[in-house]
Amino acid sequence: MNKKFLVTVSDDYANLTSLEFICSFFKQLSEHQITLLHISRLDAADMNKALMKMWEGPDGGGTGKLTIGARKALDKAVAMLKSSEMAVEQMITKTFAERYGKVKDILNEGSEGLYDAIILGKRASYTLQWFFERSADETAQSIIQDSSLKTPIWICPEPEAGRKNVLVCVDGSRGALRAVDHVGYILSRQDQHTITLFHVENGAGLNTEEMFREAKQILQTHEISEDRIKTETDWGISVAATIAAYAQKYRFAAVAVGLEGSDQSLLKRINLGGITTSLITRTEKFSLWCCP
């Protein structure tokens, strides 16, 4: 089944790490549909200039108006996808002025478009790249605690050559199992990547054998073969630090974590969001997949 991704693009055409990640991660990008999304800031200096024009994408499927910088960024994004052998007709472009704030706008678009993932960039200096123009901690908390978050979010720093495979964090929760399901679905035809189910022991006394068994069953529904699945545990007081250290040591391309759904208490959601926020500040080399 083709995957459908929403990729954010800003005026900063020199930094398109979200595009760089998907171009390096997927073996057959032509199986996927990519929507390039640009949201103009209401106070952007060139919003009122006469040089704004309708985007005429390769497939004629674009909507909205563009600033000069956004046009350059989208042109570069198209060129990157072409070099990755993605058919141009499988690309859609959208652009519009900020409506309810960029966090809410991107979540609304992600929900309405029924995307499999929303893909953002991230600077190694711990700032979410160009898109939100806020600190990583503030943006992560805004996203994670927002009740409209229904679509997995990928936060992607500049990819490092040679990285591969996905580390999926499991703790027995429904949120973690949703992360397992998301990874299995995304990697169902990407057999160049293995999946490692990872649990951080912290004295809670959870049944890891049962936890891994249930996660493996989910992966098998996506036709992930047994030889592509690994299980690992580690001990650590700081869950986020332990996850990040393991991902760095074994050079994973991505780390997937689950978020509790809206039926969980706000306190649980905020606490789990704190772990995710901490991971965001540590994602210098691997992408972070946050699954609601």
For each feature predicted by the language model, list its residue ranges.
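Structural beta-alpha unit
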Residues: 1, 41, 79-118, 123-125, ...
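Gly/Ser-rich helix-loop-strand patches that form or flank binding pockets
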Residues: 4, 27-28, 103-160, 249-292
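Small/aliphatic-rich secondary-structure junction motif
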Residues: 1-59, 162-230, 252, 282
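Hydrophobic anchor at the start of a short beta-strand
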Residues: 34, 88-94, 153, 195, ...
